Amino acid sequence: MLEEKNLITNDGIRIAYYDTEESKQPILAVPGIGSTAILWEEVAKLFASDYRFIVIDPRNQGRSQRTFKGQRISRHAADLEELITKLNLKNIIAIGNSMGAANIWAYVSLFGYNRLQAIIDLDQPPKMIRDSSWEYGFKDLTWQNYPDYLKINFGNGIFTHINDEMFKKAKADSGKFRYFAEENYLCRIEHAMQDWRDVLIDLKIPMLVLAGQNSPFFDYHFAFAMEKLNQMISAKIIKNCGHLIQAEQPLSMYKEVMNFLKRI
């Protein structure tokens, strides 16, 4: 259903993406750091009857090229812009899990809203470092232990069982296209230091925040704190779910997103 394609960026990097290639309103999905497009397969099937579904493997992960270049959120946003331009996508529903949501916020900051209808954030607060202005950070990350704390292997964030076939595919792919966390460390620390609240306070399009109730990375109450930033933002909690909402609870995610899209 999802056919693999490739984009060569303006800095010469091959980006893999997957596309149902239908003439419907597009959903553009962005995995988090270290994750893969394969883990979106089940939720893609649910959306396919009503939407064109596109999911990107960000640079340095999935089937995309490994490179030392572009280990920053702005470059990931530029990759999205190049893909959107290549496919001439309009009226996009952009869905980002974890750092994928930050990539979308960076895209909005740099390129605006003209091609977007709505944003869905899957388990990513606007700020990762806990301080006096924001209490819902990433685990125990503070300015006192940043960035060394990010060298720890925190696992994949999965709380509940995911589809066996999809998991096997992802595991097989990870053996062929290995992800090296240490080679993406600069991107990880750049991601963690960002504060996207200025972008979200000024957000001009609707955004749904879905938080995993059992996420090992974030206190799900961050979603309700995000609601208070802007009346364009709404929040829902996905039960029995960790950090990878699209893989752990695809049906619950689909229902919440569809209900959200009907309201806007």
Q: Which ranges hold each PLM region?
A:
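Alpha/beta-hydrolase fold catalytic core
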Residues: 1-27, 49-51, 90, 258-264
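Conserved acidic catalytic loop of the alpha/beta-hydrolase fold
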Residues: 75-92
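Gly/Ala-rich beta-loop-alpha elbow adjacent to hydrolase catalytic centers
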Residues: 96, 100, 104
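Flexible "cap/lid" loop of the alpha/beta hydrolase fold
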Residues: 105-110, 115-147
